[in-house]
A protein has these predicted regions:
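Conserved ABC ATPase "signature" region
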Residues: 26-28, 146-164
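Conserved ABC ATPase signature
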Residues: 169-173, 177
Length: 278
């Protein structure tokens, strides 16, 4: 099976950069800072594949670079090096970092969906939940309003939102309901890839479990590829067949999730595993 998405040698630097941190083998010091110029090395030399229908997990502590990688894939974070190859454009396999503005919008609005930990990043709080999801179809040039409304309502039912709450504004939803609306918005245009950036962070444990169950059932039902970012390695274990462990902007370990968690080779991975068990 050919990859849906291939990330090669991805690099993101915050700051002016220098020959050292912009080179092929930067040496970040404490807090991911370049010891020469002080720029932040958010991620460097990040390489991995995502296959159709799989759920890939990226785990690491705050500042490890995992959310930066998602932003680069979603084309909302400019990169300093590398390539991201995507196979589902009509023109064939393309490096999406080099596409024009129109193709970029097509990727963001149709091919990819994203769910943020902070719902304010994913939802417009000045329009209804129904409007948030319908708006994404309008951006994708859907103009049959009756069909849009029917599809939105069907999807809301799929993510277990009561029809009585369709027209409520996001501010009036609970945290779990806000995440359900984000999930509906991410799915509405039948994307090939869903990006999940700590989607259960900050939620009560019982609500977290329900959202994770929803994500797992959607993955199985729709066979859509997902990249799940989390600091909680047990959340990754629940959803993901393969895992990437990041530290200081680099991938330090990867493989089948059960293998990595049951027999971690790196001390940092061992710490992540033990911290969630305790």
């Amino acid at each position: 099976m050919n990859p849906l998405l291939s990330v090669h040698n991805l690099k993101k630097i915050y700051g002016e950069g220098c020959d050292d941190c912009m080179g092929p083998s930067p040496r970040p010091g404490p807090d991911n800072l370049c010891p020469i110029c002080g720029s932040i090395i958010a991620c460097t030399d990040v390489t991995f594949d995502v296959y159709p229908g799989e759920v890939l997990g990226i785990v690491g502590e705050s500042g490890s670079g995992k959310s930066t990688v998602l932003g680069c894939i979603n084309l909302t974070t400019p990169v300093n090096g590398g390539e991201i190859l995507y196979s589902r454009l009509q023109s064939g396999i393309r490096n999406i970092l080099e596409v024009d503005a129109q193709t970029r919008r097509t990727l963001q609005n149709i091919h990819f969906g994203i769910v943020y930990q902070n719902p304010h990043l994913g939802l417009n709080f000045s329009i209804s939940g129904e409007g948030n999801v319908a708006e994404r179809m309008l951006v994708a040039d859907s103009r049959n309003f009756a069909a849009i409304q029917e599809k939105v309502h069907n999807l809301f039912e799929r993510v277990e939102l009561s029809s009585a709450r369709f027209k409520d504004y996001p501010i009036n939803y609970s945290g779990g309901m806000q995440q359900r609306v984000q999930i509906a918005k991410a799915l509405i245009n039948a994307p090939s890839l869903i990006l999940l950036d700590e989607p259960t962070g900050g939620l009560d444990v019982s609500v977290q479990a329900k959202i994770l169950d929803l994500i797992r059932s959607i993955s199985r039902e729709l066979n859509v590829a997902m990249i799940m970012v989390s600091h909680d390695i047990q959340v990754i274990r629940l959803l993901c067949k393969r895992i990437i462990v990041m530290k200081h902007g680099r991938i330090i370990e990867s493989g089948l999730t059960d293998r990595v968690i049951d027999d971690p080779q790196q001390a940092y991975t061992q710490t992540l595993v033990h911290s969630t068990i305790q």
